[in-house]
Amino acid sequence: MLKLEQVSKVYKGGKKAVNSIDLDIAKGEFICFIGPSGCGKTTTMKMINRLIEPSSGRIFIDGENIMEQDPVELRRKIGYVIQQIGLFPHMTIQQNISLVPKLLKWPEEKRKERARELLKLVDMGPEYLDRYPHELSGGQQQRIGVLRALAAEPPLILMDEPFGALDPITRDSLQEEFKKLQRTLNKTIVFVTHDMDEAIKLADRIVILKAGEIVQVGTPDEILRNPANEFVEEFIGKERLIQSRPDIERVEQMMNRTPVTVSADKTLSQAIQLMREKRVDSLLVVDRQNVLKGYVDVEMIDQNRKKASIVGDVYRSDIYTVQKGALLRDTVRKILKQGIKYVPVVDEQNHLAGIVTRASLVDIVYDSIWGDEENQLMTI
């Protein structure tokens, strides 16, 4: 789908920002460019839509040499998302989303319908169409920035640290949301980031650059298990090199499949009684279809017992979750990094499938850190 052949960028004075890069990207692939500041990751991405002109080499999109195309027309066929979002403050959300379709002379009704379709994909209703950017939160604005890039149905989308300015909770939520969206729409993504956790979480393959050259290309697993050299090891970080047991790769293989749950219509007394019976201090709240709604713990009940009567009055909906097909290492990292006690496991429709607890990860982390040493001692 996207092919870079011996692509270089040399600035005046002879400074090489990018040096003879070769890369093949398949249709529907999610590629992350990552590396230290000045490594050439953003320059490489900007050469793909000719915001920066290559000094030499060739770039092909669907077999066509981009240097033989009008740069303005080229950019209209490529989605582009930046950290600063770049929504026009005087335009409504619908007008912002429809910007490129309007330039492509789509009929007005088709533009409106496309905006409605896209909002639905990120769980935003049609009432947002006539609002202005200042009426939205930072996370909502960034969602609109992503939707604008998708509006004209481009096969390729370039993203330059799009979630870098967001708070950690919003950032994590948008990453999950966008990865799901990418799988659904099967778009080819080139994503620039400085955050290795983000690259590991999102990418099908990671491209690590240093001083304008590619040092290693591989899946997150390949790079974590077999760093190309000392630079890659140091860039990844020792804590990220903690590996899960080789026989336990995905969350669903080791999750507890019978988490303790409660419905929102149960009384606080019933919830406390259930906690006592199951010897737990919190419960996952689900509806009749077993869709996860949030959680309630003993502290919430204690603080609200005089002014609330049912679980639905006190439970919290802001809860970290992972997909049951997620790699186990991502869950290990989330639990350890965020300091949380457990992570609910859900399917694509947010049905509760299980739970991974902090305690259940102790053996896995122990084996990851000490397993090799113990094996070596046993062979001495």
From Swiss-Prot:
Residues 2-236 form the ABC transporter domain. One of its GO terms (molecular function) is ATP binding. Induction: Repressed by OpcR. It comes from the Bacteria. InterPro entries: AAA+_ATPase, ABC_transporter-like_ATP-bd, ABC_transporter-like_CS, CBS_dom, CBS_dom_sf, Gly-betaine_transp_ATP-bd, P-loop_NTPase. One of its GO terms (cellular component) is membrane. Keywords: Amino-acid transport, ATP-binding, CBS domain, Nucleotide-binding, Repeat, Transport. ATP binds at residues 35-42. Binds cyclic di-AMP (c-di-AMP), which may regulate the transporter activity. The keyword Lipoprotein does not apply. GO terms for biological process: amino acid transport; glycine betaine transport. Residues 255-314, 315-373 form the CBS domain. Belongs to the ABC transporter superfamily. The complex is composed of two ATP-binding proteins (OpuCA), two transmembrane proteins (OpuCB and OpuCD) and a solute-binding protein (OpuCC). Involved in a high affinity multicomponent binding-protein-dependent transport system for glycine betaine, carnitine and choline; probably responsible for energy coupling to the transport system. This is Glycine betaine/carnitine/choline transport ATP-binding protein OpuCA. It comes from Bacillus subtilis (strain 168).
